[in-house]
Regions:
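Acidic helix-start/capping segments at beta-turn-to-alpha-helix junctions
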Residues: 72-90, 176-181
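A short, structured loop/turn motif at beta-sheet edges
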Residues: 34-38, 71-77, 126-133
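A structural "domain/chain start" motif
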Residues: 2, 16-67, 170-183
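Surface-exposed short loop/turn segments
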Residues: 67, 81-137, 167
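C-terminal/domain-edge helix-coil "capping" segments
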Residues: 19-31, 119-121, 128-137, 141-183
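Bacterial N-terminal signal peptides
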Residues: 5-16
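Short, intrinsically disordered, charge-biased short linear motifs at domain edges
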Residues: 2-5, 132
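Second-shell loop/turn segments in exported
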Residues: 43-51, 68, 110-112, 140-147
Length: 183
């Protein structure tokens, strides 16, 4: 009886590393007010080399439509989507030899975690071509051990575009959202 109870406890602890709260780290920045005509075109440099990138663009397209934006070939707004999937246990620095600064810190593995985390990151940028300025930039990222980037994308798109058409600001707004799901 006691042995069975211990097996149940150990099994529950092992599985606990797979499901639980997922933090979506969000950074959004409305640099200039949106244009009245909310037509947009896709950046010609966005690669559609795989189905995850194609899915990201499709989800961004749908959410922009819900926010009143319409795709048009001669639109003033240019939309760029960047998608990344990388090992989370490496840090990313930027700069030259004298001014190196950390962009992303390495993530430590949780106790009882049986696999290594990956970071799923989506960045969506809107440029006002008529004014020659960046209109909006939003990024969202999550750590996952077992979840796929395709499973993360609906949440990443919603988070990355959460500040679109908000108040303009000189500094980006950083927030963290928490949801339940497969880590």
């Amino acid at each position: 009886m006691i042995r069975s109870f211990l097996v149940i406890i150990v099994s529950a602890m092992a599985v606990a590393g797979c499901a639980g709260p997922i933090e979506t780290r969000v950074q959004s920045h409305q640099l200039i007010p949106a244009v009245e005509q909310k037509g947009f075109a896709w950046s010609p440099i966005d690669p559609i080399a795989n189905r995850d990138t194609a899915l990201a663009r499709d989800l961004v397209d749908k959410l922009l439509a819900q926010k009143g934006y319409q795709q048009a070939p001669d639109a003033a707004i240019l939309v760029h989507v960047a998608l990344a999937d990388r090992p989370a246990d490496i840090a990313i620095d930027a700069g030259d030899d004298k001014t190196v600064r950390p962009l992303v810190a390495a993530k430590e593995q949780k106790s009882f975690q049986s696999c290594k985390d990956r970071e799923h990151r989506l960045t969506v940028s809107l440029f006002d071509q008529s004014r020659g300025q960046k209109l909006y930039s939003g990024s969202a990222s999550e750590y996952h051990c077992n979840g796929t980037i395709a499973q993360s994308l609906p949440f990443l798109v919603d988070a990355a575009l959460s500040g679109l058409d908000g108040e303009t600001s000189d500094v980006p707004l950083s927030t963290v959202r928490t949801r339940q799901g497969l880590e």
